[in-house]
Structures are given as C-alpha cells and as structure tokens.
C-alpha cells in the first residue's frame, strides 16, 4: 500500500516557469526508473511501468516533490550495494507521487588514504561533499533527499549540506527542505583463516625463542581482534618489528599481509564493524532524528519494505517547517551529543557536529558541545569490544533479531539513568521521540541477555570526548571513552617528556624503531635532574630507592616500571598546514607495542581515526601554522597531564627540578621565536605536497568546525531558542 505525497506548497517552481528543465529531466527520471525495474527483476513482477515522459512532465510542472537519492562512490566499501537501495528508493518515490532523481558524490575511504598523501584531503572532502550536494540540489531545484549514508566524511558532509539548504530555502521564503538518511548496513568483520592463524602463532613462538617476548605478546594481541582494515595496521607494525629482529623474512611478511588483507572485508561491503567514524556517524545522525529506525542498524542491504517505511514517512514531513532538516538537527542537538558520548563516538565528530550546526545557520562551537556534554554526567552504556563478540555487526544482529531497537534503546536507557533527553524533538518518522518511545516492546537493553552491546547499567559514570585546555594551547580533545580506567590512572597527574616530530612520517619511522628507547637514553634526550623530578612526581614510592642511580640505570628503571612518561608530539598537521590528517598510524604503533603503550601519549594538531583508542590528544588549537604553542615544543620539554581535570600544561623545568609544579610557557615561547620561524618555513614548504586547490585557507579552526569563513559568519541563530518543536498540521507550509 502506498501513501500519497502532497504537492510542494511553494510559489517557486522552475519546472513550471522554465521549459528546459521539463525537456531535459524526464528522460533522466525515466532512465532511473527503467534501470531500477531491471535491477529489482522478479520483485517487480506484475508492476506495470507508468512513468511515461508525459506523466513525468506533469509531475514536474505541478510541483510534485522532487526527491534526490544521494549515493556514494562504489570505490568505497560502504557504497558497493548502493545500486540496489537506489532502485528501491526510486520506485517507491514514484509510487508515492514524487519524482525521483539520483546522483552520487565521491566518498573518500580514510582507511585507504591512511598514512599516505590522501589523508591530507580527508577532512577537506567533507566540505567538498557539502558544496557538491548544495550545487546539485540548487541547480536542479530538488525539494528533498533520501540519503544513502556511508562512512568517514560523507555522512556529516551531507547533513551539513542539507541543513544549509534548508536554511537558505527558508531565508528565501521557499518550502522547507526535507531529508531522511539510510545508513549503509554494517560490514561483517573478517576472520583470520585457521591455517594463517596457526602460521602467525608459530611466528609468536619463534619470537619467544629469539627472546622477543614483547613481539610474541603483541602478535597474540593482534590475533585476538576481529579482522578489519585497522587491525591490519597493527599486524603490519608487529610484523615489521619481527622482520627487523630476523624472526621472519620480507617475503614471509608480504605473504602474511596478503593473506590477512584478502580475508578482511565481506563482499557486500558496508560500514566497517568497528565503532569508528562510520558507525559513530550512524549513531549520531540517528540521535539527530534524521534516520528512520527501519534502516538504522542492518546486517545486509535494506529490503523494499524497509526502504518503503522510510520513504513513506516523508509524506508527513513535506511542507512542514518542524521537519525541515536544519530544524530537526538543531532540536535534537543535545540528544545527538549525549548519544555520541554514551556510545563512545569518534573524536572526528567533535568537528563535524560543530560544522553541521554552523552550516544549518546556528552559532555553535566546541565549547557549546562541551557545555552540553558536561551539563549532566553521561554514563558509558556501550559495552563495545572487538575481541569479545561485541562489535557493531553484533549490535546490528541484536537489533535485526528484534531483541532491541538500536539508538531508541540507548535513548531509553539514558533516560532510565537520569539523563535528560529532548523527547519533544521531531524526527524523520514524522513523530517525536516521545511518540516513538511510547511503544515499549523491545525497548529495554535487557532484551539482549547475553553479551549485550547496549547496557542498562553503566560501565562508568562518564563517557565521550573531553575538551582539554592548557597554558600553551586553547583547546584540544581526548576520547575518554577510548581509555580504560587503568589507562586514565596511568597518565593522570603525571609529568611527561616531550618527544617532538614535525611530521607524521618521521614519527612513524621512529615509533617502529626497536631501539627508540635505547637511542633516547644514549642521546641523553631528557635532562638527568628532570628525570629525577619526573620520578618523584610519577612514582614517589620508588623515588628514594632510585634517585641516586646513574643516568642509564635510572632511565631503564623508570621505563621498566612505567614511571617514565613520554608525550609524542606530532606538530604541523593542522587543517591549514596539512589538511589535518589522522594520526591513526603513530597511535596504532604505540598501542601495538606493550613497552610504549605504558609510557606514551600522543599529542597533535592533527586528527585521529574513529577507531583510535588510548591516550590520544588531538585537534589542538591554535595549530602550529597559526603560531600555536605546539609549534615551539622541543624534545625534552616537560608537560603535566591532568586528564581527569581536562588540562595539560607546560611545566617550568627549572622550578620542576626544585620540586615545584609551576606552569609557565610564555617565557619559553619568547625565547624560541627563531625556532618557530624556522619551523613555519618548513611547514610552508611541506604544504606544497598538498594540491593548492584543496588546501583549507579561509576556514575556521578545529574548535569551530573547520568550515569556510562565510559559513561561520552566516551562522547567527541560537540553537536553543531558534528552533520549532511544536507539531503542525499536515501541509503546514503556506
């Protein structure tokens, strides 16, 4: 049974007033519908095509809803099966009286671009996607969209575009823009073939026989994870170390990498099963009210019935300002942030949330996000694991089995744990959250008795991504959900030596060097008196026992007991300097090395992958290219980490050696102006590695979403007052 879409109540209709559109586009619509019928094959048996050019002309002329189906490029795993979903959506839009169109945007895969020049284009691609979508929607005068949501920068790029369109249409006095999002299904993580597993276990045994127990343990750690693109990087790092020590040959290394790679991805694609930016975006956009629950959490491409439910709901949204994309997003911003936090979402989304709000016309920044995040404690209700059968594919199976309801369940459990949620906010079902949650069946997390991903009882009473301040920078972020309580304890209120790099390549090379700690010791990279002070701060119980040790012995003792803390700083990676690439690989090399993992944090003005875990601090502002304090740091400087208090400060080293915690950076900055100028010159030279057409000059900083300045300047609305949550009658637009 179909529903009937109302005509668009809008005095503006280029297809009525300009004959060229009615001459050009009917063949495009007919072609799309013909292909859709062919793709769906037997499912269309008995359906007689009624999409004549004359009928298409009439619908265009009379302002039937023109709905763009926005897909992604099939060179990204999330979009391999778009053709099928496009076909289902096109047929249903036509059956309901609309006019379907289709276009796709390029979609960068951050995994494919990882650790190569492509990563400098990743963040910029979000704004490029937004621009391309706005261009196409405005040029062809589409009223709404059905979005096949993929991974990485595409989801929030399209959210930003459509919120921007809604705002500009409303400014021009036109009908509100409506949209619904359909996340690609979850890709099933790969399994290591049993024969390969045995081979790699043999490598671990060989490592033990060579006295390389650390490699054996790290390799077995990697073997405990589901197979995915990010775990391949962990294997790569451990196998390189094994090769350096003569445990395996280069040829064996290549064979292992090949066998792992080809076993990684399921042939139907989807969004990778880890809780990275792709699945974090799934949860976030659902929390924004923009995803129909029928399509939110699937293990396979959607059926026709599932697509129909989403598209049919558009009938109650069309012409209703409450259900304009920008209004839905802003009305749900607190819901979205609390779901993002409770589900351990990606740090990337800190920028993307801010950007989407700015594109939607709302004045918003990182500090607004932080205020919402800390208005009330947000418990950790996400028991996600890549080693214990609780990845996002497992969550999707729990939802598809009818035991729970995905983000509706998380929304419910947040309220049960005392978190205020905006239940009156509109969603793309054409109803509010309150109406959606009034159906209690399968709502509680207790519906999954065994190995649940969503919990009713919190793991911890805090979660999410924290904003950090310090005396040498204005803002940075750390994914507190990505750190265990033990890790927090390990680095909190600790003094850490800076190990400085001005580019990621140098950092990666160094972090893979088996002799890194020995070289730091041999080069006397850290001042002896400062090492004694660090020992006293970080391990006071051992201070009297160890403080008189000579340099080498003290270094070894502190490294062995974990008292030596190192902040690996990768500078010059900000959006303007180098496109803000992810520092996933250096952090992965730290995490895959049990010696370094106890000692090292990573600090950068770059980003991190959504799958990154551990003590990874990024998005530092101002970035090095803009004279931020990170530009002036040197190996051997000392930072004081207060992660629970959300602070990192530069220590006065001389006072620290005297047993005092005094924070002073300005004197150091003034003394290092010449060093800063030398580094800025190197940054400008290195910047030429990125195509000039795609550099992000004229953009806001990471705390303000990294959006074009014009977008930020036009964002003047208040996200709490300039929204509409009052339900309006059908066809409310006049």
For every predicted segment, state its role.
Residues 1-75, 93-98, 102-104, 118, ...:
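Catalytic or ion-coupling anion/metal-binding cores of large enzyme and transporter domains
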Residues 76-86, 580-581:
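Glycine- and acidic-residue-enriched helix-capping/strand-helix junction motifs
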Residues 77-81, 117-125, 150:
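Short coil/turn segments at secondary-structure boundaries
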Residues 79-82, 138, 144:
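Internal mixed beta-strand/loop scaffold within catalytic domains of large alpha/beta enzymes
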Residues 81-113:
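Small-residue-rich anion-binding loops in enzyme active sites
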Residues 103-140:
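N-terminal small/polar loop signature for handling phosphorylated ligands or for N-terminal nucleophile
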């Amino acid at each position: 049974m179909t529903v009937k879409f109302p005509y668009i109540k809008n005095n503006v209709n280029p297809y009525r007033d300009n004959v060229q559109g009615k001459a050009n586009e009917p063949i495009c619509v007919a072609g799309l519908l013909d292909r859709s019928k062919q793709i769906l094959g037997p499912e269309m048996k008995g359906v007689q095509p009624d999409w004549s050019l004359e009928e298409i002309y009439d619908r265009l002329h009379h302002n039937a809803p023109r709905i763009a189906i926005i897909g992604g490029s099939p060179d990204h795993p999330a979009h391999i099966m778009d053709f099928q979903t496009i076909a289902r959506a096109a047929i249903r839009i036509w059956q309901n009286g609309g006019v379907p169109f289709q276009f796709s945007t390029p979609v960068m895969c951050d995994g494919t671009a990882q650790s190569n020049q492509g990563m400098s284009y990743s963040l910029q691609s979000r704004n490029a996607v937004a621009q391309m979508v706005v261009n196409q929607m405005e040029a062809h005068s589409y009223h709404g969209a059905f979005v096949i949501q993929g991974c990485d920068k595409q989801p929030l790029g399209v959210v930003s575009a459509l919120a921007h369109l809604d705002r500009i249409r409303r400014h021009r006095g036109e009908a509100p823009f409506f949209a619904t999002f359909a996340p690609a299904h979850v890709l099933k993580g790969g399994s290591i073939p049993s024969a390969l597993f045995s081979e790699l276990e043999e490598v671990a045994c060989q490592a033990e026989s060579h006295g390389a127990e650390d490699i054996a343990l790290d390799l077995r750690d990697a073997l405990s994870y589901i197979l995915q693109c990010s775990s391949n990087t962990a294997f790569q790092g451990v196998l390189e170390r094994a090769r350096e020590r003569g445990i395996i040959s280069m040829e064996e290394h290549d064979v292992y990498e090949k066998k792992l790679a080809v076993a990684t991805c399921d042939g139907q694609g989807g969004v990778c099963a880890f809780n990275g930016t792709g699945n974090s975006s799934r949860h976030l956009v659902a929390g924004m009210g923009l995803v129909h629950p029928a399509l939110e959490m699937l293990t396979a491409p959607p059926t026709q019935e599932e697509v129909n439910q989403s598209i049919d709901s558009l009938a109650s949204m069309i012409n209703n300002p409450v259900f304009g994309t920008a209004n839905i997003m802003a009305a749900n911003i607190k819901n979205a942030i609390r779901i993002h936090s409770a589900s351990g979402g990606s740090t990337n989304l800190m920028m993307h949330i801010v950007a989407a709000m700015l594109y939607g016309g709302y004045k918003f920044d990182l500090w607004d996000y932080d205020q919402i995040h800390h208005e009330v404690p947000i418990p950790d209700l996400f028991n996600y694991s890549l080693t214990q059968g609780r990845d996002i594919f497992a969550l999707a199976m729990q939802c598809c089995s009818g035991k729970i309801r995905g983000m509706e369940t998380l929304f419910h459990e947040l309220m049960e744990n005392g978190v205020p949620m905006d239940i009156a906010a509109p969603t793309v079902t054409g109803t509010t959250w309150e109406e959606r949650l009034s159906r209690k069946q399968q709502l509680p997390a207790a519906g999954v008795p065994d190995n649940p991903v969503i919990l009713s009882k919190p793991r911890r009473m805090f979660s999410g991504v924290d904003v950090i301040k310090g005396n040498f920078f204005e803002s940075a972020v750390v994914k507190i959900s990505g750190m265990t309580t033990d890790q927090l304890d390990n680095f909190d209120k600790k003094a850490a030596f800076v190990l400085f790099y001005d580019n990621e390549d140098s950092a990666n090379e160094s972090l893979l060097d088996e002799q890194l700690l020995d070289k730091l010791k041999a080069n006397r990279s850290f001042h002896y008196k400062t090492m004694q002070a660090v020992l006293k701060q970080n391990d006071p119980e051992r201070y009297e026992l160890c403080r008189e040790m000579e340099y080498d012995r003290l270094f070894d003792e502190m490294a062995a007991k974990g008292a030596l803390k190192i902040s690996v700083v990768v500078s010059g990676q900000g959006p303007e300097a180098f496109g803000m690439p992810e520092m996933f690989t250096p952090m992965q090399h730290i995490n895959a090395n049990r010696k370094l993992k106890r000692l090292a944090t990573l600090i950068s003005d770059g980003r991190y992958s959504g799958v990154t875990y551990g003590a990874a601090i990024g998005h530092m502002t101002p970035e090095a290219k803009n004279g931020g304090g990170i530009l002036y740091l040197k190996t051997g400087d000392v930072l004081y980490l207060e992660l629970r208090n959300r602070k990192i400060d530069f220590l006065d080293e001389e006072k620290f050696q005297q047993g005092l915690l005094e924070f002073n950076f300005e004197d150091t900055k003034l003394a290092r102006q010449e060093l800063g100028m030398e580094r800025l010159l190197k940054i400008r030279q290195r910047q030429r590695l990125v195509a000039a057409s795609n550099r992000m000059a004229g953009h806001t900083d990471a705390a303000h979403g990294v959006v074009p300045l014009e977008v930020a300047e036009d964002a003047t609305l208040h996200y709490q007052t300039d929204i509409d949550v009052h339900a309006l009658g059908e066809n409310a637009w006049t």
